[in-house]
Curated annotation (Swiss-Prot):
Localization terms from the record: Cytoplasm
Family membership: Belongs to the methyltransferase superfamily. RsmJ family.
Record's keyword terms, sorted: Cytoplasm, Methyltransferase, rRNA processing, S-adenosyl-L-methionine, Transferase
Residues reported to bind S-adenosyl-L-methionine: R106, D107, E122, R123, D168
Any one Gene Ontology molecular-function term assigned to this protein's record: rRNA (guanine-N2-)-methyltransferase activity
Pfam families from the UniProt entry: SAM_MT (PF04445)
Gene3D superfamilies, A to Z: Vaccinia Virus protein VP39 (3.40.50.150)
Name of the protein this chain belongs to: Ribosomal RNA small subunit methyltransferase J
GO cellular component annotations of the record: cytoplasm
Reaction(s) catalysed (UniProt annotation): guanosine(1516) in 16S rRNA + S-adenosyl-L-methionine = N(2)-methylguanosine(1516) in 16S rRNA + S-adenosyl-L-homocysteine + H(+)
Gene name of this polypeptide: rsmJ
Role, per record: Specifically methylates the guanosine in position 1516 of 16S rRNA.
EC number: 2.1.1.242
């Protein structure tokens, strides 16, 4: 079953959603529940959001300046982020970074706030639509350093001008871990995990772009992407950044 067909059994699209998205069009949440759809996409407080039909949880939206994300983007905080340390200092004037698995754009926003010019690539049409909406509401100073590529597109005009390629592929939550966060749980329903072959293809593709380094985000206890040992790593309490330097 293709992903678009599978999403018809999982995701309900409420009136007003962007056209052309995969999913099952419904008139309201009640219809989505009647169709046994797990999630709905629609507008909530002028934001394109994802939530469980009939549920009490706050919809998942792309918002760069609210709550914890807003705190992480403050100038005095962003320079201490482990991701920024993993990116290192650019050579010459190469400050462009390709975030090839943009997701909700949270890490891309950190990189942009740190002064990198970030290109966001996201293959999920649902997440891409949510990113586009979030960027429309983001501060102009942040958006100036962020460029959302066409859905599923990762082509850039001058790959040799890249400082880094950033990868944050989906990773299954540990069965013995505490309740998975809402956003990760819902994203896992929308985006399939890469298998071993896809992991190798993703890493090979990223390294072939000619950037100074490839930075891969992983759970701290997870194995290396595709089993390939990095040049070095930056470890935190929950996540680890594996850095593959390129000649």
């Amino acid at each position: 079953m293709r992903q678009s067909e599978w999403l018809d059994t999982v995701l309900g699209l409420l009136p007003g959603c962007p056209k052309g998205l995969p999913g099952f069009w419904v008139e309201n949440e009640a219809q989505a529940s009647g169709q046994a759809l797990e999630l709905v996409l629609g507008w909530h407080d002028d934001c394109l959001g994802l939530w469980r039909p009939g549920g009490k949880q706050t919809p998942l939206t792309v918002s760069f300046c609210d709550g914890k994300q807003g705190y992480r983007l403050t100038p005095e905080r962003v320079r201490h982020e482990r991701l920024i340390k993993a990116l290192g200092k650019p050579k010459d004037d190469r400050i462009r970074v390709l975030d090839a698995t943009a997701g909700l754009g949270r890490d891309a926003a950190l990189m942009a706030q740190a002064g990198f010019q970030v290109m966001l690539a996201e293959r999920s049409p649902i997440l891409h639509a949510m990113l586009a909406d979030g960027l429309q509401r983001a501060p102009a100073s942040l958006v100036a350093n962020m460029q959302l590529l066409a859905c599923a597109d990762s082509k850039i005009a001058e790959p040799s001008a890249l400082h880094a390629v950033y990868l944050d592929p989906m990773f299954p939550a540990r069965e013995k871990s505490a309740a998975v966060k809402k956003d990760l749980q819902w994203l896992q329903r929308l985006c399939p995990y890469p298998d071993e072959v896809e992991e190798q293809q993703l890493l090979d593709w990223a390294r072939a772009l000619g950037a100074s380094r490839v930075v891969v985000k992983r759970p701290v206890k997870a194995g290396f992407l595709a089993g390939v040992t990095p040049s070095f790593s930056q470890k935190g309490k929950a996540v680890r950044f594996d850095i593959y330097t390129c000649p």
